[in-house]
Amino acid sequence: MLDDYYTWTYPDIPENVAQELLQLNGSLVVVGIVGRSDCDQANKMVAFGMEPPSEHTPKDGQMQCYYKPGTSILLLHFESTYDAEIAGQMIDVCIEDVDTPFDIDSFFEGIRCRFVRMMLLALHVCHIVVYVETGQTFDPTLITVFQLAKFAREQHLMQFLPQMLRETPAARMSERTRLCTPRILFLFENFPSDEPKTRECVSTYEFQMEDCIYELLRHHNIVTNSSSNSLVALPNNKQFVFFNAHEELREDTLMKAVECLNETMYKPDLKEEEEDLEILALAPFDGFVKPFALPVDEKEWDNQQYKKDHTVWNFLERHVQDALMGCFEAGSFKQHAQQGTFQLLNSKEWHDCMATMHTLLVENTKDPNLETSNEEYKNFLKNFDESLNYEKKFWAHLCELGLKKGIAAYKNAAPENYGSATHRQLLAEATLAFEEEGRGPQAQAALAKLASICHKHWQDGRQQCEQLSLRSHPCTLPKKVPHEKHNSGVIHISSCNCGRTQGRREDPFNLRQANYEFYEHIAQMCNLCVKVKQYQFPIFEPSVSDYRAAAFEAAFPLLNNGKSGAPQDEDAEEDEAEEEEGQEQEQPTEEQLQNTASNCCSQPLSPTFGSDLNMSIAGFGASLKESQASSEQLLNSEQNTTSSGTSSADTDNELVVELQEPAKKEAREDAGPAHAVSTSTTEYLPGLVHTVSNFGLLPLFPSWSLACVGPSSIYSHNTGLQEHFQSGFLSGANFLLPWDVQLRLVHAPKQQYQQQHHGKKQQRWKKQGDRLSLKIFVGMEYECSRGHRFMMCAPDRVLRGGADIERETCSMVVHNNMPLYYPCPCRSQNNFLAQLMRIHVVTPKAPVNIIVDPKVCVGRYTFTMGSIVPPRLSQSAYWIIRLPYVYQGDDVLIAPPEQLDPGYPLTGGYLLPGMFGVVETDPTLDLNEPDKMGASAAGNFTRI
């Protein structure tokens, strides 16, 4: 016995307590204490002045009994998952189970189900149930607990309890399987600290809380007009809410220590207390200095009396008296009394009923596979927790609705065939449709199921081929349907080789479609392309039927026939310079030409971005050796870029051209053809020709085009390029740039020259120091996929009209790296990139030929036209060089950039400077048949 009460853990009742309880006969009122606690022993009896033994350990489902002698009340304290200590124990168990991830939703559902089970037991074996709340407000989630308890009682317990209790001592509990409709009371352990603790204030709080609770219980049918059909009962005209306003149940030990410290620090001096006592001793009678007592304030006395009477015991005693007097259920709100349903049992009878109910509702649930003949009870044991998890069912139902809505949204919007991008967009729209309904913890699993169903629907004959084109557009044809030719559905507008006719081109999927087939097709529709003179580029000519593309190793992608590499020291450079001088005096043999050309085509790429300016020796002569310097250094060093037998000097901005001696011309005619080097007839170059590609490999088809579209007179610098001649140019961007080039002709010695040549034609070159002023018109044309064409007047500026053309404008174009891609100035929401597609050249009417050898640097490759002999352009003519539409290395496709920063236009590729040269006119050469031109036909020239 502790103080003035007994306490024990059910069912271990002490003998002496059992004897005392038996003496109560039929006047034992059982009060159940349930609710929340936040102390270590899970004790909710603090307001009653009771506590368990110090060695007590709280457990879920454990019941602690309290009995105060002299009363008729048996207090049954239920320890449940709503106690903070027990909830902490459950969390520790979940954390220790490392194999199962912690799920807060499942954990919360488990806590609630266990509490509902204990609440059901309390509602069946108690007359009064006191719900203890540690907060200052009513917890709305308690309404959910009452709803679940009512559902479980009506749908589960009432299906098997009446039958199973008939053969047990609990049969006296009648068909309702409980002692009565228990009266529910609410105990709030804390009162708002900022409110005055007077009778009026405390009563107001209690009345307001009673109104709130009553409305909630009535609204959710927890309390009805029929007490037998109600889960709980409420008293009529009696208080059922109690606020503990005057007693500090759980004092703050820290604050108490602070108060003790303050009292110690501010304790009055002991001498002052002794002096006060001496003064009081001199008084003639008691009360002379101060009155015997303070005057009594009636209001304060009333508050003190209210504080004395306002205890939880007095609050509970009034309801116990109703039970003992037999008017327990008659006092409920508007409820019809049900005679014979309220029972007061003696101690032994109650323990028998309690044992039966505890076994059925608590003990047996620990074994869900318990053998029983009652199917309803078996269903209760297996599915009780699942039936109470209504949120899970609710969320599952919402997710099912959202899943149906998402699938319908996906299927209704899905076309007959679509690609992965459309699939992702449709799936995103289906996800949004799902989220309009789907909620809760199961939403992620439902979304995964939605994605799986949509993906399966897409792959069921609706998936597109999605083979990427050379412009990175997927093929839109069905994947499962065989098709010989891919089609992305993207249409580009492009011009023909000569630029006169524009047409619609399908998105290319291979190099042949991009760089050859389209231009051959549109040439049949252009009345100019069929008439113009086309330069014939060298292509692969197979000798066997099973020819194939050349294979390139990953580690060594460059196939070289001869020695490669540039001189690494100064001595080697000097030796080569001597060799060049020797070659001027002697005729090169066929073997020397082959070795020299092979070596020159095997120059390694520079590792520095933008500095690989290896001018192909095939383009500028047989003995040219270039360093890996930048383009600016090459422009400033004329002696490294001129070919054998060429003299160049930068004197007064003039280019010096040394005219060939007649003897050398005759010797040149006897030289072998330019392509004397053997080329493969069984393997072809899969990509475009570049500076380090194998010299013996040729492409299957030409990717470049060089055509003479007419005489120079068809271009007027006053009007620019007319629409009927070159269509699609933007306004003001259709002008070529004039380029003035000063030449000084240096002739052979007079005697040797006059001995072999006579005639009027040579008279203007007879005198050394003859000067020529060449006017060349050059245009760098860019074209976007919408067919817009424009010229550029600088590497970073689009030509806006004749006012943009100045004297040095063309020099900025031909002597600088020109970007391969540039943003199109056309007004469009999308940023279309224009590509350098054509180079316009109007040659002068002079006794010289313009030589062109463009080189395009893209990535690690420097692409060339692939011609060993650089093309000579005829005099006084309009020539157009059409560049490749798509660039491809040995086995690597180089796609255009998706976006281009205008501040760094060269990142996508660029045209190297120094593509133009000038050479003496040779009437013996056929410019349109490069195969018949000698090896030195382009060797003697000066680079402009």
UniProtKB/Swiss-Prot annotation:
Q: Report the protein's function.
A: Involved in nonsense-mediated decay (NMD) of mRNAs containing premature stop codons. Probable component of kinase complex containing nonC and recruited to stalled ribosomes.
Provide the family line: Belongs to the SMG8 family.
Biased composition, class Acidic residues, residue ranges: 568-589
What does the entry give for GO biological process? nuclear-transcribed mRNA catabolic process, nonsense-mediated decay
User: What protein does this entry describe?
Assistant: Nonsense-mediated mRNA decay factor SMG8
Q: Membrane-spanning regions, if any?
A: none
Q: Where is this region: Disordered?
A: 559-601, 629-654
Alphabetically list the UniProt keywords. Nonsense-mediated mRNA decay
Tell me where the signal peptide lies: none
